[in-house]
Amino acid sequence: MSTIEQNLIGNTAGLSRVDKVLRYFFFALLIGTIVYSIGGTFFGRDNRLNDYGLADAALLLAVFIPGYSRHIPGAHRALRACEWVVMACSLVSTAAVIVGDVTDHGVRPEPYNMPWNVAMGAGLVAFCFFVVLLIAKERARRRGLVPPAR
């Protein structure tokens, strides 16, 4: 199986039902924010693509995170907790961007307002915990615990 095939949303071999539901939930949320941000650019008062781009990046991480550590034999609960932290931070980032969009009524406020700072912080935390998961999976792959196709 190629790297592209393993990252498709439909490839859910070895995942639990909860992981599948979470993947589809975050995928639907990602599509919704993309459509809303593009629609808001054409029909809104202000261009919010920067803000929604941040939320979309965090959601893109969250789409592939559920079940990420399941393929690692003997994975600790800490890795599963890292998955949940990434998912929670992406939700916080998305919520902060939406709150910032609603509270300024479509008019761009100062560049670094509170919702933007919260969204950036949550996105940074999500990225850091994703890197922890990525390193754990690569270390397991180098030890020979995970086949290269996963």
Tell where the protein language model's regions lie, with residue ranges.
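Generic alpha-helical transmembrane segments
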Residues: R48-G67
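Interfacial non-cytosolic loop connecting adjacent transmembrane helices
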Residues: F42-G53, T94-M120
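Residues within membrane-spanning alpha-helices of integral membrane proteins
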Residues: R23-L30, A57-L60, E83, M87-S90, ...
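Loop-to-transmembrane helix junctions at the membrane interface
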Residues: I65-A95, V99
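Cytosolic juxtamembrane helix and N-cap/initiation of the first transmembrane helix
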Residues: M1-G32
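Alpha-helical transmembrane segments in multipass membrane proteins, preferentially the mid-helix core
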Residues: L61-H71, F130-L134
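Alpha-helical membrane-associated segments of multi-pass integral membrane proteins
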Residues: L22-L29, T33, S37, D104-R150
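Membrane-interfacial loop-to-transmembrane-helix junctions in polytopic alpha-helical membrane proteins
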Residues: N11-V21, R45-R48, H71-C82, R108-P115
